[in-house]
């Protein structure tokens, strides 16, 4: 009897696996908009992939992966498999994830509303989609080595570069939303308290940036041969200073009332992080001491028979993972009305979460119904671009691949280490990021015939 009841209970989940409403998550969470719940499920699936990739770097997993026929062929005697297997496994796992999201991105081009038949694939059929993703990942492990790793390294680097820029756009959006929220509360009442909070947050960001610059000059510019680091630190410091001054100019304030030092302080902190991340990827080890070595601890490395040391877990990599998680989940629940950012991310100006309280009662939720459901709030039009969202997750998969492997590239010269290419990718992304932020400030002054409200 118990078995029959158990089967009936399991059968009740079948509509969730195949239907259009992502009720797998809704059963655990309050009722919400379909547009938000769907994005959260895709983000959670990517998070599971990240966790599996991290497990694949654990030494205990390497022996199991080594049992795959031909997985380490032609590498014997050049780079030990106990180093290379984890590296290749992460590449193949992220390749599968990236292809899954890229296929969905192509499939969802120009979906305008949930009435489009393709929207049902986006918002439902979870079992079949995830089964397909797992099949793609498994198939990726049987791709012949050849030039796959080298080619995918450069593809991953380009994708990670684009995702860093998306991170910056979302960071600008977050800073604007943060500033607007606190300014509104300051105007509503208790202005001194909220003004102090706003000032404290801004001062803290600039203080962290100043401390970072000092530490960079102390630990990353010696010996004298580390001239590139001196240039990177100095240039980015001056660029951040210029952007901060520009954000409070009278003309900028007149055309962009939302601009201020809080946003520029957030951008400054992120730019300092990118500068640090770039310097830790320099091939010359004397110019890029790890954070743990700086504070007096030894980092864990994998040492090959040739005495080569490959350190898989860097502090900047861990911070990169944290930023990645915050970025992906923020993009899944963001409610910004910033029109400039919404145009860049192809998102509707309408809020996707605030509508929960005022969602139309069209039968999706019945009075007295205790079942948690997702309300279809996209019948008249989608609140975000399905295609762009999946493309962002495609880029996120590449960013994770590069972060987990510390931007290492396998070299036939029996070495696995970072390249100057990785350094310039990160530094150039920091420069482009500052240019993008400055453009959000000056665009209303340059393009006077356009509405930037």
Curated annotation (Swiss-Prot):
GO terms for cellular component: endoplasmic reticulum membrane; membrane. The keyword Lipid metabolism applies. A lipid is attached at residue 2 (N-myristoyl glycine). Its main location: endoplasmic reticulum. Residues 61-88, 145-151, 219-231, 281-309, 409-426 are lumenal. Keywords: Endoplasmic reticulum, Lipid biosynthesis, Lipid metabolism, Lipoprotein, Membrane, Myristate, Phospholipid biosynthesis, Phospholipid metabolism, Phosphoprotein, Transmembrane, Transmembrane helix. The keyword Transmembrane helix applies. One of its GO terms (biological process) is phospholipid biosynthetic process. The modification Phosphothreonine is found at residue 352. The modification Phosphoserine is found at residues 351, 364. It is found in: Endoplasmic reticulum membrane. Belongs to the TDE1 family. Enhances the incorporation of serine into phosphatidylserine and sphingolipids. Interacts with SPTLC1. This is Serine incorporator 1.
């Amino acid at each position: 009897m118990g078995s029959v009841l158990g089967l009936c209970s399991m059968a009740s989940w079948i509509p969730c696996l195949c239907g259009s409403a992502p009720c797998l998550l809704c059963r655990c969470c309050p009722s919400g908009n379909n547009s938000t719940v769907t994005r959260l499920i895709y983000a959670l699936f990517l998070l599971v992939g990240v966790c599996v990739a991290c497990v694949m770097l654990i030494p205990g997993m390497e022996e199991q992966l080594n049992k795959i026929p031909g997985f380490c062929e032609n590498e014997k005697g050049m780079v030990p498999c106990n180093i290379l297997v984890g590296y290749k496994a992460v590449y193949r796992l992220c390749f599968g994830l990236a292809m899954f999201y890229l296929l969905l991105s192509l499939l969802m081009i120009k979906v305008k509303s949930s009435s489009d038949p393709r929207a049902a694939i986006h918002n439902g059929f979870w079992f079949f989609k995830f089964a397909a993703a797992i099949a793609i990942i498994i198939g990726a492990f049987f791709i012949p080595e050849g030039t796959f790793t080298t080619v995918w390294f450069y593809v991953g680097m380009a994708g990670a570069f684009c995702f860093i820029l998306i991170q910056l756009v979302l960071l600008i959006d977050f800073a604007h939303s943060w500033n607007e929220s606190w300014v509104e509360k300051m105007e509503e009442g208790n202005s001194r308290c909220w003004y102090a909070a706003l000032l404290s947050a801004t001062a803290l960001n600039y203080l962290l940036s100043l401390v970072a610059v000092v530490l960079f000059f102390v630990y990353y510019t010696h010996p004298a041969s580390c001239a590139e680091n001196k240039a990177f630190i100095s240039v980015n410091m001056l660029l951040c200073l210029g952007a901060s001054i520009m954000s409070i100019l009278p003309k900028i304030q007149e055309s962009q009332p939302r601009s201020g030092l809080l946003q520029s302080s957030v951008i400054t902190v992120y730019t300092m992080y990118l500068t640090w991340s770039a310097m830790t990827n320099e091939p010359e080890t004397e110019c890029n001491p790890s954070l743990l070595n700086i504070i007096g601890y030894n980092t864990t490395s994998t040492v090959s028979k040739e005495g080569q040391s490959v350190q898989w877990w860097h502090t900047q990599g861990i911070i990169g993972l944290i930023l990645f998680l915050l970025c992906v989940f923020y993009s899944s629940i963001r409610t910004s009305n910033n029109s400039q950012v919404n145009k860049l991310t192809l998102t509707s100006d309408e809020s996707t979460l605030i509508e929960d309280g005022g969602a139309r009662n069209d039968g999706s939720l019945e009075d007295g119904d205790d079942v948690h459901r997702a309300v279809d709030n996209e019948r008249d039009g989608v609140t975000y671009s399905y295609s762009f969202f999946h493309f962002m997750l495609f880029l996120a998969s590449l960013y994770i691949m590069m972060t987990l492997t510390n931007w290492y590239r396998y070299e036939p010269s029996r070495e696995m280490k970072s390249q100057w290419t990785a350094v310039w990718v990160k530094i150039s992304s920091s420069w482009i990021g500052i240019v993008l932020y400055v453009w959000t400030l000056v665009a209303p002054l340059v393009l006077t015939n356009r509405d930037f409200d």
